[in-house]
Swiss-Prot record:
Organism: Azorhizobium caulinodans (strain ATCC 43989 / DSM 5975 / JCM 20966 / LMG 6465 / NBRC 14845 / NCIMB 13405 / ORS 571)
Catalytic activity: a lipid A disaccharide + ATP = a lipid IVA + ADP + H(+)
GO cellular component term of the entry, any: plasma membrane
SUPFAM superfamilies assigned to the protein according to its UniProt record, in alphabetical order: P-loop containing nucleoside triphosphate hydrolases
This protein's encoding gene: lpxK
Identification of the protein by name: Tetraacyldisaccharide 4'-kinase
Pfam families: LpxK (PF02606)
GO MF annotation: an example: tetraacyldisaccharide 4'-kinase activity
Claim: Transmembrane is one of the keywords in the record: no
Amino acid sequence: MIGQAPAFWSRRNSLMGWVLSPIGALVGALTLKRMAGPSTGVPVPVICIGNPTVGGSGKTPTALMVLARLQEQGARPFALLRGHGGRLAGPVLVDPQTHTAADVGDEALLLAQATPTVVSRDRPAGAAHAVALGASHVVMDDGFQNPSLAKDVSLLVIDGEAGVGNGRVLPAGPLRAPLAPQLDRADALLVAGGGRCADALGRLAHSHGKVVLRGQVRPDPSVIATLEAGTVLAFAGIGRPQKLADTLAAAGVRIGRLQPFPDHHPYQPSDIAPLIAEAARERWQLVTTTKDHVRLADRRFADMAGAITALPVTMQLDAPEALDDILRLAEARAAARS
């Protein structure tokens, strides 16, 4: 869990990035050593949606897309998460009617609205629990750098605008480990959006022999239609809050102001009440992400919920058939393990 990314993470020649790079080299080496550790498998295909950096890249919309495609094919996939921001160690099957973000984390609540979802800090135990409950596939949202659960396919997601920042490893930059060896351990790269880094990322992945997918995060048009006539006050506590503003602006919505919060921020009424007051004063609509909105789904915010609009988004691939190829690869590898 991180707050706002330091500005120097996006600057190639920053002094702070250079000063911290020896620590980053150590962190990267330790992470790569950990990634080479032993794994435990389960008797169903395991598909990991990961990213090589910290912060928002579009993993959760990608996981939802993969889960939806498997469901369309008649499968019964389960989502598996560590449960960032939640207190439960698991394994536990998430119940959106009784669990809160404080229990299982915001991402798990969001995924549980679409498919059976297990939260477990011990990923092999979580996957085994999902299989015992009837999972045909396990789709991991994050966990690429954790070797404990054997993965049949790993799909990395990188934002096409942010890329990998300054290309350095934590804390000198946003990478969790050096990019090249992370790519070598993946099967495919999804470049989310057509930003300034998109083409270079695609070329790099191709040079490592990886399948490259291109996709766009699209907002729900019915919700956008309710926002187009006015101005919005947007707030978000995600890896890249600016992404919400960019999505709204690209859809033609006027933004009065963006209020960022740290990733996975545990909202309090004292955070939200001033935003509601400001929006009312300025005659703006208050809008946030679905991931933020699930953190407001408890009785402390009961009187505030009606004033906040959640903006659902979906990941849409430029070539959807490429996803089917990746899913078939996962199933073939799982069958070969059996």
